[in-house]
Amino acid sequence: MECRVTTARLEISDFPRPAVARSLSPNGRVHWAQKHLARTAVHQRVWLEAFIQQLPKMRGLVVIRPTFTYPIERRRDIDNACTGVLKHAIDALVRGAWLVDDSLEYVRLEPPVVCVKPGVRSLVLEFETSDVVTDRQLPSVAESSVPAAQVGSTSQPRGRR
């Protein structure tokens, strides 16, 4: 069996908006409802872009190379962008089944690259994996779940003893 390395790319333009990035930053002090709205906005935008750009579903170890592009040059703490926006972007890819899981077993996150281009704000995620699957290769929920007869069963009968 031949093992090929496949690279995929997800480019999200005009993202992240400053208000969203501030809300999701670990240093941000916002109300929980505002943080929830920001997290939901990131999940929806990433899911939509992955769907539109036909990002392939990946399994196995995936290396992710994030590139943040900002419109103006200034001092930035990139750790805040990674722990805020990038965490929720990866969570959205897991929820949409583009990634199996975001644990160390499945995802390696490389240090982010920061670029400055006047008038451009974007997040580019480059994925490198050795295993890309189509929808037909993914097991269905019925195939991977425990049979209904075994759910909730115990080795001992119920009742008083």
For each predicted feature, which ranges?
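Catalytic phosphate/metal-binding cores of nucleic-acid and nucleotide-processing enzymes, i.e., regions
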Residues: 1-161
